[in-house]
Amino acid sequence: MADERMRELFLSGKTTDRAYRGETLGKLYADVRAKKNDIVGFLAGDLGRSAKECAFIYSSMIEKPARIAAKKDWTKWRWLAPVLPDFITTGRVYRKPLGLVLIEADSREPFLFVFPRFLASLMAGNPTVLSFGGRQTKTGTLLTELANAAIPAEFGMIVSEGEEIPMEEPDYVFAEEYPGRVCAVFDGTADYDKGAEKLIYAWRRMEGLNGVKPEVIYCPVSMRSALVKQIDKWARRSPDDPDGRKVPVIGVRGDEELAEKLEAEGEMFALYMFSGEDTYALRVALDRPYKYASVNSVTLRSPSMKAYFNESVNSKTIMMR
């Protein structure tokens, strides 16, 4: 079985050797560069965008993550709000070797969003299988072929929907669906009452869409009183609800402490509330240990590629090289 060979490779310590990773991922990086024109052409066909825009997308979302994975050693993880060129930071959950990793991508998630996460897992020294069940595109098909040709099967591979997953006993399954009981707020606004109102509205919509009813809300200490007030408002608006929509609201100090609290809860559904700086919106879209439901109470599903591209172009967070 492939996972037996993966286990042997991981236990040998070879996957955590920088030279081995550099050689393996370096070949993929070289192939990605060699196929630049083909990839840009496929992007133009898949996305219906100009060649100039697709060159920009290739540079930031394909070539740069591949270069980082091939040429840089895994650095100490930092809690920073990443911008789009730093897409490799989606792998922050892989800041240390975990063993055999299975990535089960959400069916709504574009291939360009999961490919850097696959590279990040390999970069951390994890034998990794990416199971992609989303819409097949020419770009995704080409990148899959390049990855599977360059990376030894016992180190990593990409399989499409319908193909057999050659990993029966992974140490870590990275999936997009996190059923659970926790609703978490990582950042509020200066106007806490308004932010809390948006949060409760998004939560109500989320419950209707996903069937998730949070039993606990963790939030920054500064937002606690505003959230309690908004929950009380919803309770008064829903007299037929036996529990009055009231749930415990626990204030936690700081992102780090809040993240540790959520990790201790195990499986969960985390509802993020972001507003204000654009970097917060980017972070909620890129951080993957917890599934998000709302960015500024607008979207309750995986972000669209168009939103990413427009945001990047308008704010000039990516520069063409």
Indicate where each model-derived feature is located.
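Short beta-strand elements of ligand-binding domains
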Residues: 159-160, 175-177, 293-297
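Conserved acidic residues
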Residues: 99, 169-173, 215, 268-269, ...
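ALDH superfamily catalytic-core signature
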Residues: 146-151, 170-256
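A glycine-rich helix N-cap at a beta->alpha junction
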Residues: 152-159
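Donor nucleotide-activated moiety binding/catalytic core segment of transferases
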Residues: 87-102, 162-167, 244-246, 264
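Conserved small-residue-rich beta-alpha loop and adjacent elements
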Residues: 82-150, 180
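Conserved C-terminal structural/oligomerization subdomain of aldehyde/semialdehyde dehydrogenase
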Residues: 8-27, 102, 130-132, 202-205, ...
